[in-house]
C-alpha cells in the first residue's frame, strides 16, 4: 500500500473495476426488494454545475446504502435534451441544435462518470432521440382519441424573446420562466391537454404521498385550487346596449346584496364589444394585454379600469349595475368576470375608492358592529345585514339561502371550480417533439398513423432566430394527406418540453422496448422509491408527471397511481457574489476564484480586490450559484485538484440536504484533509500488522481493557447513528460528523496489544463501510487493503453488536436539593451504597455541599442521585 493518498490514481482504479464488471447494471429480481432511486435528469447545457453534483451525490449515497442493505437498486441517468437553449446556442454558433446537444451530452456524461456515481448506463436515454419521442407522439394520439388532447384558440402567455407560448405555470412574476421577459397576452390556436379532468384525483391523491414535503403538497393543492361557490347570472340591461348576460363565479354569495358594479377581463367579449367605438377603451385593453398574467401578481399591481357604458341587472333586486373593464380580472379564471363587492373584497375596495364607486357593507362581525365608513374591506365570514330578506343570517346560511333563490329564478347554481387550467402544449419552436398531425384542406386535421411514427425532426436545421423554423422548412411540412392523398401540411408546432420529462422515469424501466411505450418491467420498478430534485419543480414537472402517469394508468400502460413515493427537495448551492459598477452604470460580476479577500491583523475581513488589477471589488453577499452572477465553481476543477471523493464529501458534510449549502474553499480543504487522514490511518495499521487479516474473535469483548471497551461501544453507537441518519433522516452531515468523532478517538489507540489491533481492524473496516456510499473510490481501495481478496461492493451494511453497546459504566446525574450540580461515572452494576459513596466523595460535589449536613440521599438507579442538605 502506498503511503500517500493520490486521489486521481485511486479513483481511476476504482472506476475501472466497476466498469469492467458492469456492477451497477441491474435486471428485475422478483424475490428481492427493489429500490428505484432517481435524481431529476439534467438539461445538457455543456457542463455540470455544483447543483448537479449535490443532487446526484445525494441520490448516489442513498442508492449505494440500499444496495448494501440487499436491495435490487436501479439508479439510471438520461438527458432532458429538447429546449430553447439549444436553439439559441445554435443561432449564436451556427451549428444544428442536435450537434450542440449531443456534444454536450458526451462531455457531461464523462463528468458524471468521473464522480463515481453508481449509474446503470445501459438505461441511458435522451429525450431528443426519435426512439424516445415517438412515444410522446403515440400517447398524444391516444389522448386525442380520448378527448384529453384537443385544439382551441385562446388568449395565451406569449414570451416575446423566445417567441413562443408559455403555460400559466411557466410565468413567474409576470415574466417568462426561462428568459425573464415580460409576458404578453395573445390569442393563438394551440393544442391542450385536459389536466382539469384529473383535478379532483390530483388533489385527493396528495394524501397518498406521506413521503413528500408538506410544502410541496401545499403548493400543488393551492395551484389546483379547488373552491366551492355559486355560478350567478346577471341579466343584461338591453337599454344600455349590453349584448349578453354576464356569468360570474363567486365563493361569497353571502355578499351578493353588496354588489355595486361588475368587472370583466380585457379579453372578455363584452369588453371587446364595448370597445368598438371607444378608442380610449381600445388602448386600455391593449395595455392590459401587456400586464400581469397570474392572480398573485394581479393582487399587488395597481388597480386600473374603464367604464364601458354598459349595464347588467342585479339578479335578485333588478338594480342596474355598471360594467367595467378592470386589469385585475383574469380571463382564465371562472368566466372572466367578477361581481364586485367593495365592502368585502380588498381588490374591489381599492378599485371602488380609486374610481369613486359605491361601497355597500352587507356583512358584519358575528360579535360586533362594522365601523362605517370602512377604511378597509371586511373580508371575513360574519352575519348579514342591509340585505333585505337575507339579513341576520350567518355567512354559510346566507350562501345556501341565496343559492336556493337564484336556482328558483334560473339565475344561479352551486358549483365547484378549480384554479388549474388545461395544459397548453403547443410551442412555436423547432427543437422539440413534433406534434403528429397533418392539416388537409379537404379532410381537416388528420392524425399521423401509428406505423408512420415517429415524425422526425430534421436534425441538420440551423435556426436563424426569427419565427418558427419548422414553418419555414418545406422539406419538413410538405406532405400528402393519409386519407385523401392530396397535398397537405404537417403541424409545425412542437410540444412543450415538459411533456418529455413527464414520463422519462417510466421509460428507464424498459429503454430497449421498441414495440411499445412500456411493458411489465415498469410495474416492477415503479413507483420511484426516492425522487430527488429542486423545489422549483413543485408545480411544473411534478404536477405534470403525476397527471401523465394517471393518463398512462387509465390507458392500461402502468398499474400505479402515483409515480414518486418519496420526494427529497435539495437546497441550492450558494457562493459569494463580487462585482463592480462600470462608468456606464452596468454591473460586471467576477468569479470568487478571481478575487482575493483581505483581512486586518486580527483576521477581520476588510475588503476584496480583483487579482488581475489589485483594485477593489464590492461584495453582493451570498447568492445562488449562477452564470448571470458569475459565482459558480466548476466541479471539474475541484475533481482535478482534490478528487471526486473530496467534492462528494464536502457536499454531504457542509449542510443537511434539504437546506442551502454555502460554498467554502476551507470546507473543501477540510474534506480533503480528512480523507488523507483516513488513508494514513489504514496505511499505519497495515504497516503495523503486516498482512491484514479478517476480523476474528481473538479477544472477547468482555476481556478488552476498559478504555478499549468504551471505544468499541462508541464504534457500534456510530453504526447505529449513521444507519439512522441515512435510513430515516437523510442527514448525511451528522452521519459524517459521527464518523469523524470516531476517527479522532481511534488516533489514541496505540501499541500491539491483540485487543488494540483487533479493535483497530474492526473500526477501520466499519468506517470504510459506513463511508463507502459517500466516498466510494477511496473506500473501494482501502477495503482491498483491509480485506485482501474481497470486494467492498459485495459487503452488507454494518450491523451494530448489541453486546458492545452495553456500557460498563453509566453516567449518573447528581443533584443537591433538586438542582443539577454535576455527574459521576460508575459501574453499571453498582448498588445504592456505592452510588451514594461515590457521589459524596466527588471533589466537586463536596464543594457544592460546603460541609452542610446531609439529611438524606435519594437514588434513582442508573439515572440520578439527589442529595438533600
Swiss-Prot record:
Q: What is this protein called?
A: Leucine--tRNA ligase
Sorted alphabetically, the Gene Ontology BP terms of this entry are: leucyl-tRNA aminoacylation
From which organism does this entry originate?
Answer: Nitrosomonas europaea (strain ATCC 19718 / CIP 103999 / KCTC 2705 / NBRC 14298)
| EC main group | ligase
Motif 'KMSKS' region per UniProt: ranges: 624-628
Where, subcellularly, is it found? Answer: Cytoplasm
Write down the PROSITE patterns for this protein, in alphabetical order: AA_TRNA_LIGASE_I
Please name the gene that encodes this protein: leuS
Q: Which Pfam families match?
A: Anticodon_1, tRNA-synt_1, tRNA-synt_1_2, tRNA-synt_1g
At the top level of its lineage, which domain of life is listed?
Bacteria
Q: Which UniProt keywords apply?
A: Aminoacyl-tRNA synthetase, ATP-binding, Cytoplasm, Ligase, Nucleotide-binding, Protein biosynthesis
- Motif 'HIGH' region: where in chain: 42-52
Q: Name one GO molecular function term.
A: ATP binding
InterPro entries named among the record's database cross-references? aa-tRNA-synth_I_CS, aa-tRNA-synth_Ia, Leu-tRNA-ligase, Leu_tRNA-synth_edit, M/V/L/I-tRNA-synth_anticd-bd, Methionyl/Leucyl_tRNA_Synth, Rossmann-like_a/b/a_fold, tRNAsynth_Ia_anticodon-bd
The UniProt annotation places ATP binding at 627
Which Enzyme Commission numbers does its entry carry? 6.1.1.4
Primary location class = cytoplasm
